[in-house]
Amino acid sequence: MQIPETSSVHQNEWQRDVFVLSSGTCLPQQKAEVYRAHLAQIQYAWANSEISEASAVHLFKKYAEKYSAILDSDKLEIGLNNYADSILTMAKCQRNESDKWQSSLTTNNVLKLKSVQEMAEAGRRAQLSLLNSTDASVRVGNEIGTSGYSTVLAHNVLRNPSHAVPHAASSDCQIPEGSSNFLQNSKVSAFTKANTSSNTLINNSIPINTSLMQRNEVKAPTTFSTQSGPNVFSSTTSVYSGKRKACYALGDESTDIQPKPLVQRQLASKEATGDSDFKTAKEQLWVDQQKKHSNQPQRNPGPLYGGGKKSLGAARSRGLHGKFIPPLPRQEDVEDSNRKVYGQGNSEMNSTSDEHLKNIEPKMIELIMSEIMDHGPPLNWDDIAGLEFAKTTIKEIVVWPMLRPDIFTGLRGPPKGILLFGPPGTGKTLIGKCIACQSGATFFSISASSLTSKWVGEGEKMVRALFTVARCHQPAVIFIDEIDSLLSQRGEGEHESSRRIKTEFLVQLDGATTSSEDRILVVGATNRPQEIDEAARRRLVKRLYIPLPEASARKQIVVSLMSKEHCSLTEQEVEAIVLQADGFSGADMTQLCREAALGPIRSIQLMDISTITAEQVRPIAYIDFQSAFLVVRPSVSQKDLELYENWNKTFGCGR
């Protein structure tokens, strides 16, 4: 069957899409699909140099505008209404981050409130009273000035002698426009009161409500700081309620007037009393977080939408009905820590490896390192029976160049790919693994299923990540079992994702971005070599035929397997078994020995199977192999052997 050219196929698709657009029954969904197909075809044509860059930009802009007009139109007749409730419902659980997001709650808006203006007026009246008399009393009731704040501030300052008032007064805070009177008056009244009547505060000139102080210690006060963002004030409704829920504290990040958190104060009190055996989940989590972030520099958090709760006033203590905080870290924290640990670099990787892996997703690297990279026991060439020509050829072109790259340079360099084809069960997988073991290379074993994904674009990303990790672990051997399923011939009815995976694999194997110094060998094994794509066959330079084992190889398999069992076979009986097993593959010989090993077990009576010991089981005899030949048959037909031999004569590199 003659395959049509790619250009004719794309032309037919373009004409079909134009007819769909011109029809009067075309729905908006169909129009969007057509324009999306046009964009993909334009990108494909530009990538293959079929059109110029200027033409591609012009066409892409033209159809992108048409596509956007259909998506964003709110009319059901001509658009899809991209801002409909159904679309927003799908995206409502997604995190929305934006550096340009600004809150509508600003300091100027708060200062315009009536209650805040009354507080400012009360502060000015308190300032006048302080100027007239240094020993002013504090009124607690419906009208409270900032002298109440000065009482609390002075009490906190006097409790901590290290926090002197001049040190606190040296901290400057940024006062927004329009709020200078209120903040300056409050600041002047606070520190004037703290300086002139500190002794009076200790005595009884100004009464201090101890219950008020306890409540203020429990709740973390809101501070005016030099950080960017809207300043948060205490609740204005509590000013006239007679219950002070929070106090103000002036100072920037350099001041230490702020009280410690509740959990830290509780831990300190428990350690002082000696009762520190039991810790709640919240306390334990706080301790773990302090240990975790003790050596890390503090940084401003990113602008997360909904990440931090903004409120007016201090947080209300939730008590028993509060949110439960588990003592174990969250899954997001574990993933972030794992990424940080991995980002610090493995001791086996140099700086070049880190540069290669920085653009690869950590999950893909972890998948390749844990599942695709093989960590099985080592193999020797003696473990593979027969196949002397294949083993000798592989040693010459693969193993020796990897062991001595200084000698095998230039034209003596190893090939990029090897294809092992032949009947199933002849040891192709063992040869691929033995190459990695004998050359000291890292062995990657993949299949078509390990590179496919239900998400668009994930397959080619996995292929790119595989070769990137292999370049970081050179020398490396990438073994592809059943390579015909991954690199089959590309046709018209092939899925687009499968085509992209093949293209990416061929580019990584031998493309413009590959380096001749990379010591990466791709070994493919297949029992259907006629289905491999022509481009892949060209890149797999050495194509070795792995035939059925000869008589000497079959004898070696029988002797090797029977040496581990209790048997009574003579040399003549072994020769007879080998001659009778003509046409058997290596896997068939193994199955034959397994079936013969069950012969002594089948000869035991059913009533004696539970009481007989292992020493009383008779050895494996020649009659057991005769019974096994009645059950086990060759898995390769003569017709298949002729197909392999003909393909070997046409494309093979063997004798």
UniProtKB/Swiss-Prot annotation:
Binding sites annotated in the UniProt record for ATP: 385, 425-430
Pfam families per record: AAA (PF00004), AAA_lid_3 (PF17862), Vps4_C (PF09336)
Enzyme's top EC category: hydrolase
CDD domains, sorted: RecA-like_Figl-1
Cofactor: Mg(2+)
Matches recorded under Gene3D superfamilies: 1.10.8.60, P-loop containing nucleotide triphosphate hydrolases
UniProt cross-references to SMART domains, sorted A to Z: AAA (SM00382)
Family statement: Belongs to the AAA ATPase family.
The protein's assembly and partners: Hexamer.
Entry-linked PANTHER family: AAA DOMAIN-CONTAINING, DYNEIN REGULATORY COMPLEX PROTEIN 11-RELATED
Name of protein: Fidgetin-like protein 1
Organism: Xenopus laevis
Gene transcribed to yield this protein: fignl1
